[in-house]
Every structure is written in C-alpha cells, then in structure tokens.
C-alpha cells in the first residue's frame, strides 16, 4: 500500500479528498486496462509524456460536456484519430479511469479501519465459498426463508448521494453525475429487470461499484438488528473491493439507527438470523415463526422506501417454509426434506418400532432454467430438442468439440454439489447431440452418417474426467472407505465462480 500511495500521490490528494486531479494521469488508464503497476512501462518509460496525456483527457472531458459530440476539428482528428470514432468512446475511456480512481479512498480507509480496530481481514472479506457450508450446516435447523429481490433506486441521483458520505470532491461527484446522465440517455444504465439491477456491459466495473456501495448502505442495518448474525459476503462485484469501507461505516450507522429504529428493535430479537446476498438476490433465514418473518418483510419494505428511497413492494419478498418449498438460489433448487426412518428398540421382552424423521438438505439441478439458457444460446429449442449451432460451423472440428466440451464440463463442475444429478445428464445429452448436429452440418451430412464415418470416439470429450481441483468437502468420520465416501457425497468446488454463464442462468 505504501507503493500505491507513492505511485498515486495519494498523500497529497487524500488530505482533502481530491480525486479529480488523478483522472488526468495516464497510468490510471493503464490500470483500468489491466496493465498493472509495471515500473518499466509507467515510471521508467522515456516516451511517457504527461502533458500530452493531460491534453487528451481534457479534450475528452470538454467534448463530453459539449452539446454536439460530433464536432471534432480536423487537426484533433489527425492527432488523435480514436477521438472521432463515436461519441461513446470518450464516455467509456473516462469512466474506466474514473472507476479505478473512485475505489482508491475506500481501499485506504478500509485498511486503516482494519488496522485501527485490529479486525482480522479474513472475517471481513468472506467469499462465495462460505455460502456452501452455511447451506449444509445451518439450513437443516432453520424454518423460514425470506427470498428477497434487492430493490433498485428510483433515481440515479441516489447513487451519487450515497458516495457523498465518502467522497468530498465536488468535481468528481459532478463528473459521476454526468456519466450517469449520459449512460441513461443512450444505453439505459439501470433498468428494472425482475426488480433487480441490470448493468451495462460497457463499464461493468463502475456500475457494480456504485451498486455495491448503495446496497451496503441499507445492508448495514443488519449489523445492529442482529449483531451475531452469519453475515456472508457478496461476490457479484467481481474484481472490486469486497464490502468497501464496511466496518468504517458502522460507527456512523450506530448513531443513526439507534435513534430511528430503537422502538422497533425489540421485534427482531432472534438469535438465529442469517443473511446472504448474491447476484441481485438475498435471503434472510430464521428459526422463528411465520409471524416473525412477516414482520421482517414489511419492516424491510418500509425501511427501503422511507429511509433509503428505493422502490420496493411486498410482492418482491417471498416467505418460504423450507419443509414445503424449494429455494432457487445460486443456480440450485435447495430444500430441506424429512427422510423417514424406522428404529427397532427392545427392552427386556418388549420391542418397539420408533418412527424417526431426519432432516436432509437437498440441492437439485433446475432443469427448466438450464434448458431456457441453452435455448437462448441456440443449442436447443424451447422444448429441449437439440439443434445445430450454425455460427460455429465455420470452425475446425477440434474447436467445435472444445467449445461444447468446455460448456459441458463447466456445468458439471458447477452442479457437482447437487444431490440429484439426473437432470444434469439430460443437459449433457443436449450438448452432445447439438455438437454432433453442428459437425454434421459443417460436413454436409446427417448425424447418423457422420458418426458412423468418424466413430463415436470423436465426442468422448464430454465424458472425460475432470481434473482434480481444490474443493470443499465435509467428512463426518474417518474410515477406510473415506475415499469412496468423498465421491458419493456432494462436492463444492472453489473455482465455480469462473465458469460459463450457462452454468448460472437468470
């Protein structure tokens, strides 16, 4: 971090929370494009010209504020041809650099907060992997779950107002406000899709940062309503800092929430509240009664609308009883079912049959959403009948097989934690036959004739064993059959967040 401070000149800018001057530094845009802190390129390059970089960025910002974005002089176009491509290029270039800059003060304050309070970083930076042991260990003892679609702001200005608590630089906030306004005009930055956020792919990093900082505002209330809750980390931010400046905001919210919600805290004294957020959805699980969950439901709706100015309705929160309903979360249909068993007990001359029901946590592959994703990607129709992939017909045979095989392995990899894999076998069949149809289309033949000519070994890629990777397994006892037990039980792989989009359908 000392190298970052020296490199970004943060000691000088951070004293007054000035971020705007950093946007004129060329190395900011190198970081935005993942060039990293390469000293030979950024610090020791003889061709580095800070003045030319300053002029380029100033011209881009000037054109952003102009009414007509297509009025570009001939001289400027000759010197910097990339400025004349389209009006969106300047927005994207500046916003990519701005997304790097706006994260700097939060990372510094997060580190200083952790050092001052001696909080272990691993407790703060939890990831998706902590969700799986939570599901297996905690769900069996819970009764109800609130399935919540995270609300969205009713106006983009709310996102700017959220950052005003942390960023004091008026110029940076004004530039951010301009970004949001322009993005909304030509690409609909945030649109209500299933009452959740839909981010533009043009600069997902900036939008996810704004989204997580906004959600963090009203998520902080759970710290005070349930101080010992199982607070698990959101991972939708990708490369962003997780839970930026979260602990640093606790002291501020303690004073606010203690005054506004003191009369309501007694309603929620539940020692078994668990909260998880992931990809625009969240769940609030409890061992309490249906009445308590209804209180939580209407409390959250009123809290969001009255105190955080986000649009939410009661129908966006569903109360599910785990014993009767399945929960669609993290690409699985999760439920808790009773597994009946009968125990024979004998005392002296009398014997008894005792019915015993054991709770079991089930994770099922959701076949209908997966088929919908495959149909959207043109691997099959809406009924699940495999079709060829014409856009891949120009590739080589090995490339076609490799693409289909990669998707198939990713799906198997992700759903390895499923307790029932019959649905997954159907997905593999669809992909295998779609691959065969694509190859037959390329060679202008039928599937039967093509497979007869080349042999079925050509598609053995779909049935190759996966490479051993680090995984989460929870053996109950050591035994001689422990190795066999691991293969029969569900396995949560630690790299499932880096998979194809088909493995996690919306």
Curated annotation (Swiss-Prot):
The keyword tRNA processing applies. GO terms for biological process: mRNA processing; RNA splicing; tRNA processing. GO terms for cellular component: chloroplast. It is found in: Plastid, Chloroplast. The keyword tRNA processing applies. It holds the Pfam family Intron_maturas2. Keywords: Chloroplast, mRNA processing, Plastid, RNA-binding, tRNA processing. Its main location: plastid. One of its GO terms (molecular function) is RNA binding. Belongs to the intron maturase 2 family. MatK subfamily. Usually encoded in the trnK tRNA gene intron. Probably assists in splicing its own and other chloroplast group II introns. HAMAP family: MatK (MF_01390). This is Maturase K. The gene is matK.
């Amino acid at each position: 971090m000392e190298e970052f401070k020296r490199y970004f000149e943060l000691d000088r800018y951070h004293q007054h929370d000035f971020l705007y001057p950093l946007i004129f530094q060329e190395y900011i845009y190198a970081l935005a494009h993942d060039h990293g802190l390469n000293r030979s390129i950024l610090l020791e390059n003889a061709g580095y010209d800070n003045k030319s970089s300053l002029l380029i960025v100033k011209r881009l910002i000037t054109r952003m504020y102009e009414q007509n974005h297509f009025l570009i002089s001939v001289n400027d176009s000759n010197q910097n041809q990339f400025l004349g491509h389209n009006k969106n290029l300047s927005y994207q270039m500046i916003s990519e650099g701005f997304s790097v800059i706006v994260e700097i003060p939060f990372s510094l304050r997060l580190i200083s907060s952790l050092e001052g309070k001696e909080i272990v970083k691993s407790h703060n930076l939890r990831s998706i992997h902590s969700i799986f042991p939570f599901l297996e260990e905690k769900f069996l003892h819970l009764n109800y779950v609130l399935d919540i679609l995270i609300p969205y702001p009713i106006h983009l200005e709310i996102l700017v107002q959220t950052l005003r608590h942390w960023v004091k630089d008026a110029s940076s906030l004004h530039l951010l406000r301009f970004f949001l306004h322009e993005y909304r005009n030509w690409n609909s930055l945030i649109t209500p899709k299933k009452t959740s956020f839909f981010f533009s792919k043009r600069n997902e990093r900036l939008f996810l940062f704004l989204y997580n900082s906004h959600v963090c505002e009203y998520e902080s209330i759970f710290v005070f309503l349930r101080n010992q809750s199982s607070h698990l980390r959101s991972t939708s931010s990708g490369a962003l800092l997780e839970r930026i400046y979260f602990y640093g905001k606790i002291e501020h919210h303690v004073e606010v929430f203690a005054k506004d919600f003191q009369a309501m805290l007694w309603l929620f004294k539940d020692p078994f509240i668990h909260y998880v957020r992931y990809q625009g959805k969240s769940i609030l699980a409890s061992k309490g009664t249906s009445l308590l969950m209804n209180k939580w439901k209407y409390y959250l709706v009123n809290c969001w609308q009255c105190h955080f100015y986000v649009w939410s309705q009661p129908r966006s929160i569903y109360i599910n009883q785990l014993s009767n309903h399945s929960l669609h979360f993290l690409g699985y249909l999760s439920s808790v079912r009773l597994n009946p068993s009968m125990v024979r007990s004998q005392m002296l001359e009398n014997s008894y049959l005792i019915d015993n029901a054991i709770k079991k946590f089930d994770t099922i592959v959701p076949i209908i959403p997966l088929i919908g994703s495959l149909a959207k990607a043109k691997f099959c129709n809406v009924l699940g009948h495999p079709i060829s992939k014409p856009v891949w017909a120009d590739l080589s045979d090995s490339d076609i097989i490799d693409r289909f095989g990669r998707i198939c392995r990713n799906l198997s990899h992700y759903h390895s934690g499923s307790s029932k894999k019959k649905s997954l076998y159907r997905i593999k069949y669809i992909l295998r036959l779609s691959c065969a149809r694509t190859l037959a289309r390329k060679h202008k033949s039928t599937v039967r004739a093509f497979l007869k000519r080349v042999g079925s070994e050509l598609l053995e890629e779909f049935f190759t064993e996966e490479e051993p990777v680090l995984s989460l397994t929870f053996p109950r006892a050591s035994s001689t059959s422990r190795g066999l037990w691991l293969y029969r039980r569900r396995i949560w792989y630690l790299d499932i967040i880096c998979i194809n989009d088909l493995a996690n359908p919306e």
